[in-house]
Design a protein with these regions (language model features):
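Charge-rich, low-complexity N-terminal segments
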Residues: 1-160
Length: 160
């Protein structure tokens, strides 16, 4: 569900970095948690009510760790600017030295592939257009719904 995805994204530094590390403190401070954006709220077009949310993950080439705070500040700022210019709702972003996660509300007519590629291209500007990310990325939709495919007490539903 949305709450689980957003919590996971916001907690990347806690999940991946040692508790007493300076890197954990840095990446925790860099995380984006935007309380003004609520991806559980329906958005509207002229003909429909919708929830179109994406969880996107970009991994650095060969998981190369980037620890320069200025680069990560640039990435965070570019994510914010890109989401504003695309009229996307950036609710969370979590960073660790070798990858980043973020959650967005998008328009239902947009392709998740096109959205991911557009952010990958925007973020390349922070790295002087160097190809710093793996040539693929993870993208998934999420929302408030739960199809009940996995019941918490009984596990996966039987296949019939």
């Amino acid at each position: 569900t949305r709450e689980k995805v957003e919590s996971y994204v916001a907690g990347q530094a806690t999940h991946h970095l040692a508790e007493d590390s300076a890197m954990r403190a840095l990446f925790s401070d860099l995380a984006v948690v935007n309380p003004d954006i609520n991806l559980s709220t329906a958005r509207f077009t002229a003909h429909a009510r919708y929830w179109a949310n994406l969880h996107v993950v970009f991994v650095h080439n060969w998981r190369q760790a980037i620890t320069d705070p200025e680069i990560w500040i640039g990435i965070r700022n570019m994510l914010r600017r890109a989401s504003q210019s695309k009229v996307h709702l950036l609710s969370r972003a979590g960073f660790v030295p070798d990858h980043l996660h973020f959650t967005l509300g998008i328009h239902p007519g947009e392709s998740p592939l096109d959205v991911g590629l557009s952010y990958m291209n925007n973020l390349a500007w922070v790295h002087n257009l160097e190809p710093i990310f793996m040539p693929s990325f993870y993208v998934a939709t999420f929302g408030e719904y739960d199809l009940g495919a996995i019941h918490p007490a009984t596990g996966p539903a039987p296949v019939v």
